[in-house]
Amino acid sequence: NINKIKIIDYWRSDEKYYFIDANVKKIFELEEKVETLRCHLQNMPYELGLLPSPVIRSAEELMKKVIEDKISLSRFGDGELEIMQQRERPWFQVADAELSARLKEVFRCKDERIIIALSDNFGNLDRYTEVSADGIRKYLSNGIREKLMEAIDMTQVYYDAYVTRPYLMNKDKRYAQRIFEMFKCLWRDRDILLVEGSKSYIGIRNDLFESARKIRRIIAPCKNAFSVYDKILNSVKQYADENTLVLCSLGPTATVLAYDLAMAGIQTIDIGQLDNEYEWYLRGADEAIEVPGKCVAGLGQHYEVQIIEDEEYKKQIVDSVI
């Protein structure tokens, strides 16, 4: 006894809406356009520089510093900022008081051994694709910007946390090539220790780490890695020294880990979804797509990952903290 005009069927496989009634679809699409324009208008004073936003230096400046000065990188995206306020954002990490406190500690850090990076969402968005810019505007609307700004120090100079997402979001795809080349330069002829989730398979079946001298891996949980944080930290300290470049991809856990290891004298880079971005770059993708055999965080927790049977990958694993 439900009127057909009220029925919307959600199709899980591709997250698109199918409408029983064409009029409902027209209304829905028009409402979406109105909401997009509202968010754009609300955000314009910040995009035009009429209202203040944090100082965030470019990804290229960031890469020059980590290469030349051999300093570490902790990245803060919307997930980390949300967890700092004990609100859950990423599906792969629940918020808790201890993680929130540690993230706040790292975010306030002004130590020269580590760069604190912040997603370049708060000012001009011209470099992003229309889809990406509209997504940022919608996210920052309805009081979210104001909540996030409570944690941001307007006197501090940050760097762009999107350094690890150089491809999909940006209009200029040549930019991605430059950033990927700088990353390859960072680990050229160096021993690297990857700290990654159990379904990540970072660098497997591509040439991202081809320039590295040696690759070792520590495998951690793909969800809620912070629950075994001390074990992960101790494992890294066991296998890394001041000559090792540690690369970690564990969501908010990586943000804290990069800080603790930097304070211990070990250069550590939070590489986030760099491998996914590189895979999309190689494929010429224009949206987030499945990468066979690899976890893609942006596709959600229901995305099925096939196990990669790769002997070289298995040989590189020195510890598993699951």
PLM-predicted stretches and their roles:
Residues 120, 219-221, 272:
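Residues at the C-termini of beta-strands that transition into short coil/loop
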Residues 253-322:
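C-terminal functional extensions of proteins
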Residues 196, 245-253, 270-272:
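Glycine-rich anion-binding loop/nest that anchors nucleotide
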Residues 123, 222-224, 275:
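Residue-level detector of flexible, active-site-proximal loop/helix-junction positions
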Residues 2-210:
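Electropositive, gly/pro-rich neighborhoods at or near active sites that engage anionic ligands
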Residues 197-243:
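A mid-sequence, solvent-exposed acidic-amphipathic segment
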Residues 191, 214, 267:
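Residues at the starts of beta-strands that form the adenosine-phosphate
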